[in-house]
Amino acid sequence: MGIVSPESGAAALKALDKAMTDYRDDAYDVLVNCPVEDSNIHIEGYKFTGISKYIETCLGEGNKASTLYISDNLRLMVAAERASVKDIANVLTKDLVKEKATLLFKTIRRDFNISNPRIAVLSLNPTAQGKEEQEIILPAIKEMEEDSVQAFGPYTAEEFFENGYYDQFDGILALYYDQGVPPLKALATGSVVKFNANLPIIATEPDCHTRFDIAGQCIADASSLRHAIYTAIDIYRNRKRYDEPLQNPLPKLYREKHDDGEKVRFSIPKKKHE
């Protein structure tokens, strides 16, 4: 107990595989997983890089998972979440910023019951006046405005977190991990939960390590796991509430105009005796 072993890795993989199978069989509604030691899980022909990527591969249906960090009233997503620091400037594009900010907007609207969320986009450079801000971030924000996505910025991370600007927004898009996640954790008064956004399955997990050093001592804090469970339940209810009215929309009434072919809504022809 309290050490990494082949048996514990095999047991973790067996539990994950069972969870994937049971979800396909509609055996449960949400998945809450505990931390696992990634290096201890070995799958022939597949490199295990984390639970999020594994769930994406098994149940993503072609969608790419994006981690949403949740703490108190803060929700943060990372644009270049899998890129190393030295590659961030090369990975960052207008399409990536727009894609991630729009995903964050739609996720908060659907899964957190906020009808028109406000998204803050952080800058790459300390002055927010660099080439990346002028040629990538600002054009992306402009295009999102035209698509009715409420995105604002770019804000420097120091100014944004130091002055408490985060209180004015429903979601935050950081450009890389160290820019956003450490400040979020520092500001958190409780535990942080990770949610795998953009997947059909609702999957959450506490943002903590395996802590083999305290295994079996009954001193672990269960609040983070409890928070992950409650968050998954809330997201399930919000998503169901959001999707239900969209299941059977009323059909639109159109009539073709003979002169120019444009469709006119709700244009009902008069009766002959009128």
Identify the meaning behind each predicted range.
Residues 1-274:
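Anion-binding alpha/beta catalytic cores of soluble intermediary-metabolism enzymes, centered on
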